[in-house]
C-alpha cells in the first residue's frame, strides 16, 4: 500500500516501523474518516473553482439564454445530463446571474474554508493524541529497562527518542497524510477537469508526473543517511546539554566553560553541516520540480495557442485549462517535495520502535514473600562487567545472619558496591546464586524482592518536589504523622522548623536547597518510612563534615535497629561497632571478623585503618 501511496518512492520495508506505530491511530479512525471527507470537500471545491473559469468567460458576459431543451431519454446518464443543463442555466443563463454567480463563488469558497479547517483540526487532534499515547508507552517501557541500560545509554539519547523522534514520526505523518490525500485528490480532480476541457493538452501534464517521481527518488536516496546522522547528532546535543546542566558546579569549579562550549560547538557544527545538506537538497529540489512544471506549462500554452488560432478551443476553455494547471502546480510541488519529510518520518519511526523493542529487565520470579527475616547468603558468586575476563567478584561466598550488621571495607574497585547492587538485582551474577531466607532471589518477583530493601547511598537522589513528597516516595500511602516521625528520627526537626511551610517546603532540584548532610538525612528518613527488613548503606556518610556525619550516624543507628544491615564504608571509624567486618580485595574476601579481632591480626584491615587515621588527621588539621 505504501508503494502505491508514494508512487513507488518507498517500499514496504521502509515503512515497517511506521506502519506499526499506526496502530496507535486506530482508536481515532472515525475522526480520520471525517477528516478524509473534509479533505475530499477541499479537493472538490478546489477543482470546481478551476472549472468555474470556462463558463464565466463563455457565458458570464453574454446575454441571458433560453431554457435548455432537456433529454426525454430514460437512464442515469440522461438524468445527470439534464441536471447539469438545469444547473448551468440557473447559474449562467438567467438575468439573475449578476448576483447568482458571485453568490455561488462565495458559497464555494466558504465550503472550501470550512472543509480545510475541519481537516486540519481533526488531523492535528489525532496527531497530538497519538504522540501522547506513544510517549506514555515509551515512558512505561523506560521504567521496565534494566539498570545496565540506564548506565550505558546517555540521557540525551533517551530524551531524543521520547521527544524529538516521537514528534518527527507522528507530526510528519499527520502532515504527510494530509498532503497525500488532499493534494492527490486535488490533482486527480484537476486532471479530470483538464481531461474534460482538453484531453490532448492533459497528456502533456500527465507526462511530467514520472519525471517528478524520479527527481524525488533521487533526493530520497541521497538524504537517507544524512537525516539519520542528523537525528543522532540531536541526541548527542541533548546529552551535552543535560551533562552540563547537571554538572554545572564541576564546570564552574574547574573553569570548564570553554571545554563545555567546545563540546557543544562541535556537536552544533555537525548539526548545522547536516542541516545545510538537507536544506541544499530541499532548496535544489524545488527549482528542478518548478523547471519541469514550467516546461510542461510552456508546451501547453504553445499547443493551446495553436489550437485557439485554428478554432479547436474557446478562450474560456483555454483560460480554464491554464487556471486549472496553475492550481495544480502547488499540490504537485507539495507531492514532489514530500520524499524528504517522509524519509525523516520513517527513520524517526525506526528509532521509536527500536526503543519500544528494547528488552525489559528480566523478571522470571514467581514467589512473592511479604516480609523476609533477613538471612542472606552468597554462594560461589562471580560478576563480570567486561568481556576481558576481569571479575568484579570472584567466587564470592558470604553468610549474613538475621539482624546482623556487616560492614564491607577495602580499596576502591574491590567489589564492595557490587555486593550491594547484587541484592536488589541491579547487577546480575555471572555465576553462583544469592539467597534470602533460603530462597534464590532469582525466584522472587522483582517488586517483592526490592520491597525488602531500603537503600541509602553516597549518591543521594531527591526529586524536585516538597520535603513531604520526597520522604513519602518510599510509601505513597503514608500520612503526615508517619512522615514527620521519620524526619524526626533522621534528626531533621530543625529543617522542618526552619520554614513556615514545614513538611511541605520545596527542596529544589535534587535537593539543591539543602545541605549535604540534610540531603543524606532526607534519604535516611525515606528509608525509615519504608521500614524494610534489610538495609543497604553504600558509603552513606562520605564527604560530610564532622557535625553532619555525627547527625547522620545517629540517624543510621536508629534506622538499623532490628534490621539486617550491609554497610559499605570508606571512613573505617564509622563501622567499628559492626557485628562483622568483611575485608575485600580484587573481588574476594581476604579477612573478616570484629574490629578488635582484625586489629589484633595486624593485617590488611590494620593497614587500611592506619591509612584512614592519617586521612582523618589531615582533614582535622
Swiss-Prot record:
Q: Which family does it belong to?
A: Belongs to the ABC transporter superfamily. Lipid exporter (TC 3.A.1.106) family.
Q: Does this UniProt record's set of keywords contain Transferase?
A: no
Query: One cellular component GO annotation, for this chain's record?
Result: plasma membrane
Sequence ranges assigned to domain ABC transmembrane type-1 in this UniProt record: 33-344
Membrane-spanning parts: 32-52, 91-111, 192-212, 286-306, 312-332
One GO MF term on file is:
ATPase-coupled lipid transmembrane transporter activity
EC numbers: 7.5.2.6
**InterPro entries, sorted:** AAA+_ATPase, ABC1_TM_dom, ABC1_TM_sf, ABC_transporter-like_ATP-bd, ABC_transporter-like_CS, ABC_transpr_lipidA, P-loop_NTPase, Type_1_exporter
Binding positions (ATP): 410-417
Classify the protein's membrane topology as the record does.
Multi-pass membrane protein
Described function: Involved in lipopolysaccharide (LPS) biosynthesis. Translocates lipid A-core from the inner to the outer leaflet of the inner membrane. Transmembrane domains (TMD) form a pore in the inner membrane and the ATP-binding domain (NBD) is responsible for energy generation.
Q: What is known of its domains?
A: In MsbA the ATP-binding domain (NBD) and the transmembrane domain (TMD) are fused.
- Its name, as the record gives it, is ATP-dependent lipid A-core flippase
Signal peptide start-end: none
Q: Where is the ABC transporter domain?
A: 378-611
**Which key words tag this protein in UniProt?**
ATP-binding, Cell inner membrane, Cell membrane, Lipid transport, Membrane, Nucleotide-binding, Translocase, Transmembrane, Transmembrane helix, Transport
Substrates-to-products reaction catalysed = ATP + H2O + lipid A-core oligosaccharideSide 1 = ADP + phosphate + lipid A-core oligosaccharideSide 2
Q: Does the keyword Methyltransferase apply?
A: no
Name the SUPFAM superfamilies on file: ABC transporter transmembrane region, P-loop containing nucleoside triphosphate hydrolases
Q: What class of enzyme is it?
A: translocase
Q: How does it assemble?
A: Homodimer.
Subcellular localization: Cell inner membrane
Amino acid at each position: 500500500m505504501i508503494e502505491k501511496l508514494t508512487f513507488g518512492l518507498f517500499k514496504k520495508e521502509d515503512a515497517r516501523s511506521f506502519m506499526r506505530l499506526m496502530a496507535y491511530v486506530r482508536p481515532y479512525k472515525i475522526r480520520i474518516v471525517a477528516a478524509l471527507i473534509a479533505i475530499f470537500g477541499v479537493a472538490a471545491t478546489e477543482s470546481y473553482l478551476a472549472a468555474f473559469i470556462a463558463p464565466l468567460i463563455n457565458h458570464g458576459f453574454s446575454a441571458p439564454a433560453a431554457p435548455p431543451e432537456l433529454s426525454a431519454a430514460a437512464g442515469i446518464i440522461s438524468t445527470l445530463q439534464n441536471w447539469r443543463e438545469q444547473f448551468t442555466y440557473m447559474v449562467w443563463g438567467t438575468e439573475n446571474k449578476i448576483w447568482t454567480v458571485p453568490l455561488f463563488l462565495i458559497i464555494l469558497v466558504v465550503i472550501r474554508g470550512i472543509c480545510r479547517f475541519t481537516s486540519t483540526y481533526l488531523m492535528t487532534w489525532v496527531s497530538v493524541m497519538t504522540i501522547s499515547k506513544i510517549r506514555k508507552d515509551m515512558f512505561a517501557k523506560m521504567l521496565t529497562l534494566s539498570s545496565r541500560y540506564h548506565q550505558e545509554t546517555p540521557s540525551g539519547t533517551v530524551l531524543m527518542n521520547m521527544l524529538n523522534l516521537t514528534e518527527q514520526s507522528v507530526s510528519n505523518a499527520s502532515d504527510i497524510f494530509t498532503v497525500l490525500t488532499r493534494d492527490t485528490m486535488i490533482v486527480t480532480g484537476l486532471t479530470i477537469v483538464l481531461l474534460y476541457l482538453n484531453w490532448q493538452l492533459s497528456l502533456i501534464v500527465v507526462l511530467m508526473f514520472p519525471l517528478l517521481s524520479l527527481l524525488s527518488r533521487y533526493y530520497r536516496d541521497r538524504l537517507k543517511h544524512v537525516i539519520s546522522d542528523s537525528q543522532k547528532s540531536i541526541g548527542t546535543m541533548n546529552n551535552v546539554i543535560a551533562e552540563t546542566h547537571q554538572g554545572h558546579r564541576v564546570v564552574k569549579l574547574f573553569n570548564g566553560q570553554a571545554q563545555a562550549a567546545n563540546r557543544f560547538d562541535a556537536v552544533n557544527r555537525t548539526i548545522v553541516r547536516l542541516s545545510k545538506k538537507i536544506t541544499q537538497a530541499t532548496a535544489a529540489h524545488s527549482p528542478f520540480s518548478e523547471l519541469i512544471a514550467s516546461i510542461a506549462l510552456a508546451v501547453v500554452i504553445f499547443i493551446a495557442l495553436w489550437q485557439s488560432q485554428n478554432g479547436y478551443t474557446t478562450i474560456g476553455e483555454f483560460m480554464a485549462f491554464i487556471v486549472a494547471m496553475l492550481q495544480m502546480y502547488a499540490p504537485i510541488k507539495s507531492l514532489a517535495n514530500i520524499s524528504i519529510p517522509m524519509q525523516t518520518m520513517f527513520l524517526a519511526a525506526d528509532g521509536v520502535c527500536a526503543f519500544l523493542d528494547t528488552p525489559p529487565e528480566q523478571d522470571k520470579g514467581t514467589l512473592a514473600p511479604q516480609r523476609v527475616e533477613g538471612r542472606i547468603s552468597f554462594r560461589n558468586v562471580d560478576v563480570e562487567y567486561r568481556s576481558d575476563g576481569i571479575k568484579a567478584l570472584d567466587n564470592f561466598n558470604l553468610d549474613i545472619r538475621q539482624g546482623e550488621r556487616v560492614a564491607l571495607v577495602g580499596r576502591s574497585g574491590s567489589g564492595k558496591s557490587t555486593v550491594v547492587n547484587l541484592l536488589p538485582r541491579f547487577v546480575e551474577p555471572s555465576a553462583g546464586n544469592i539467597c534470602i531466607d533460603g530462597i534464590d532471589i532469582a525466584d522472587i518477583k522483582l517488586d517483592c524482592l526490592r520491597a525488602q530493601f531500603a537503600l541509602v547511598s553516597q549518591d543521594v537522589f531527591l526529586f524536585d518536589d516538597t520535603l513531604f513528597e520526597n520522604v513519602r516516595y518510599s510509601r505513597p500511602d503514608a500520612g503526615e504523622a508517619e512522615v514527620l516521625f521519620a524526619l524526626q528520627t533522621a534528626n531533621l526537626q530543625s529543617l522542618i522548623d526552619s520554614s513556615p511551610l514545614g513538611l511541605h517546603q520545596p527542596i529544589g532540584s535534587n535537593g539543591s536547597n539543602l545541605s549535604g548532610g540534610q540531603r543524606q538525612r532526607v534519604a535516611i528518613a525515606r528509608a525509615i518510612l519504608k521500614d524494610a527488613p534489610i538495609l543497604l548503606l553504600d558509603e552513606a556518610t562520605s564527604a560530610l563534615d564532622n557535625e553532619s556525619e555525627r547527625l547522620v550516624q545517629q540517624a543510621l543507628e536508629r534506622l538499623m535497629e532490628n534490621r539486617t544491615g550491609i554497610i559499605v564504608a570508606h571512613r573505617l571509624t564509622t563501622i567499628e561497632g559492626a557485628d562483622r567486618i568483611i575485608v575485600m580485595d580484587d573481588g574476594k574476601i581476604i579477612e573478616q571478623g570484629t574490629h578488635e579481632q582484625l586489629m589484633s591480626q595486624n593485617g590488611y584491615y590494620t593497614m587500611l585503618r592506619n591509612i584512614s587515621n592519617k586521612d582523618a588527621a589531615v582533614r582535622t588539621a
